[in-house]
């Protein structure tokens, strides 16, 4: 092998190594910014197609309905705890901050946060539904995939 071919081989190897390193770093950076969507039932029993359950500490988005009677507010701070549910199960959520104006018991929400021990979500963001007939698209898609509809929502007679 002559010197010219050797130089070309080294250049090609260096370019491939640089490309592999760049792809690896990009994927590593994106991994920490990806929030996978789950329903409460998928957190409890795993994704239907893969049976993969989320890990403690994983960032995720969870969509479901706020369970009537589950909202508890701390009178001394903005801390709120509530339960969200779907046709297969329920998970507890803690959130510290101002809730959206449309947040109510029996309404659809999507929370974004981290999974903690005991199927508890520490929410960083809470998104509420827009009208009475609205179900978050992710929740509706997941429930259609399960061939189930949301559990019946109990209406507050005072409203």
From Swiss-Prot:
Secretion signal, residue range per the UniProt entry: none
Residues binding heme, per UniProt: 130, 134
Keyword Heme attached: yes
InterPro entries noted in UniProt: CcmE, CcmE-like_sf, NA-bd_OB-fold
Subcellular locations according to the entry: Cell inner membrane
Stretches of the chain found on the membrane's Periplasmic side: 30-159
Membrane-spanning segments: 9-29
Bilayer topology term: Single-pass type II membrane protein
SUPFAM superfamilies given in the database record: Heme chaperone CcmE
Basic and acidic residues bias spans: 134-147
Keyword line: Cell inner membrane, Cell membrane, Cytochrome c-type biogenesis, Heme, Iron, Membrane, Metal-binding, Signal-anchor, Transmembrane, Transmembrane helix
Region (Disordered): 134-159
Major site of localization recorded for this protein: membrane
Gene Ontology CC terms: plasma membrane
GO biological process per UniProt: cytochrome complex assembly
Cytoplasmic topological domain residue ranges: 1-8
Function recorded in the entry: Heme chaperone required for the biogenesis of c-type cytochromes. Transiently binds heme delivered by CcmC and transfers the heme to apo-cytochromes in a process facilitated by CcmF and CcmH.
PANTHER family according to UniProt: CYTOCHROME C-TYPE BIOGENESIS PROTEIN CCME HOMOLOG, MITOCHONDRIAL
Protein name as it appears in the record: Cytochrome c-type biogenesis protein CcmE
Organism: Escherichia coli (strain SMS-3-5 / SECEC)
């Amino acid at each position: 092998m002559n010197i010219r071919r050797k130089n070309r081989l080294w250049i090609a190897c260096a370019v491939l190594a640089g490309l592999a390193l760049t792809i690896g770093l990009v994927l590593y950076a994106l991994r920490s910014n990806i929030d996978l969507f789950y329903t409460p039932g998928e957190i409890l029993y795993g994704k239907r197609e893969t049976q993969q359950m989320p890990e403690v500490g994983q960032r995720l988005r969870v969509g479901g309905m706020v369970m009537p009677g589950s909202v508890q507010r701390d009178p001394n701070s903005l801390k709120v705890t509530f339960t969200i549910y779907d046709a297969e199960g329920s998970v507890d959520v803690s959130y510290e901050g101002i809730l959206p104006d449309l947040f109510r018991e029996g309404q659809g929400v999507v929370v974004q946060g981290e999974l903690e021990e005991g199927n508890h979500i520490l929410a960083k963001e809470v998104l509420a539904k827009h009208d009475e007939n609205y179900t978050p698209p992710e929740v509706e898609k997941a429930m259609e995939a399960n061939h189930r509809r949301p559990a019946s929502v109990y209406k507050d007679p005072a409203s």
